[in-house]
Amino acid sequence: MSIKGNIIIGQSGGPTAVINSSLAGAIDAAKDAGVKKIYGMHYGIEGFLNEDIIDLRKHVKNSQDVSLLKRTPSAFLGSCRYKLPKIEGNEEVYEKIFSILEKYDIQYFLYTGGNDSMDTVKMLSDYAAAHGKTQRFMGIPKTIDNDLPVTDHCPGYGSAAKYIATSLKEIIADNDSYGPYRTSAVIVEIMGRHAGWLTAAAALANNSPDLIYLPEVDFDPDDFVKRVGELAKEKNSIVIAVSEGIKLADGRFVCELSGGSDRLDGFGHKQLSGVGAFLASLITEKTGVKARSIEFSTLQRCASHVVSRTDVDEAYNAGYLAAQKAFEGNTGEMITIKVESRRPYLVSYDSFDIHQVANVERKVPLEWIINDGTYVSDEFIEYARPLIMGQIEPYYSAGVPQHISLSKEGKE
């Protein structure tokens, strides 16, 4: 294989516990192929537009650094929520991007992210094709939301699901500790705007929660209160998992009932929060049961101390293959994972046309949502259980996990 030019790798959107494993895979593939310069985008495409570019060989120098990188949460390179404008009418943005690529002799462009990030790969590869450019653009899937199409699942989801299941198991044990002398309810709010994959993972706790609510089905507050009241007659400890994005039949987010924020993120998505606190107040008001809420927030995406080994390995392989595919001439594609067998668990990897991926959202199948929209089926458990298997021990220093971070040297 003849390698011409250099490679650059970027990270975008919400970080995960294994996004750096994909970076490690891409770096190793580039080193194995003999690429001279391995660049990183500091803060994604937004940083790239400002020529904030890193020489990764100066930061990830050896196998020990790679091993530590795979144990480091968040986005090592820094992330962004910058959305590229449409090509038409904004050609100057794309001309600037390609002039920077040419300045650094970059022929291979890898971008790690979710739906909106894959749209960046699509637009750049489309521009290159329309203007006779030779650069290759590949997408590496990354999202704890697990909502990218085509691929069976997304790197990042398995570790987030493992954290959620582990935390639910511990929360249930804590709430059970008071026995018959106090009735209390805990609402656990979990990320998930339109797709409930993360909240569904609560069912992976061996002593799983009493109720699970996903955004795929309409939420009925009156039915919710009735179910909690019935549970309170049967048991003293009630634990409920809810997606932040659950909606009423009229399409409004439940969190809006509490006067939730109207702020938008960089991709134009409404920022959601407060559904757990609202439902806890509703329970206490309507049933008299003491209730409180727990919001996992960013913890569910950065808990590198409880990652899934399966997830780490698959994220690494996705990054490695993305670089290999780019070196072979592929462009405008995203790496995909296909499950060949669930028992024993075996997967294969491929790449797929980015046009069939960008801005397409995959939700939990409705047939996997049971009990009138309050739980998930055994089919979901069968699907998700292998993704959380295995663990990787952190390296410890001074009693806490050791991570790797960008040093001051190595800036271009």
Question: Can you name each region flagged by the protein language model?
Answer:
Residues 1, 51-107, 116, 155:
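Glycine-rich oxoanion-binding loops at beta->alpha junctions
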Residues 2-54:
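N-terminal phosphate-binding or glycine-rich loops at protein starts, especially the Walker A/P-loop
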Residues 3-9, 69-83, 142-152, 182-183, ...:
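Gly-rich Lys/Arg/Thr-decorated short loops/hinges at beta-loop-alpha junctions or inter-strand turns
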Residues 12-14, 41-47, 81-82, 114-115, ...:
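Short, ordered loop/turn segments at secondary-structure junctions
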Residues 16-26, 48-49, 93-95, 115-123, ...:
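Short glycine/serine/threonine-rich phosphate/pyrophosphate-binding segments
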Residues 38, 108-113, 119-138, 154-292:
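Accessory alpha-helical/coil subdomains and C-terminal extensions
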Residues 256-259, 263-412:
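C-terminal non-catalytic interaction/assembly regions of soluble proteins
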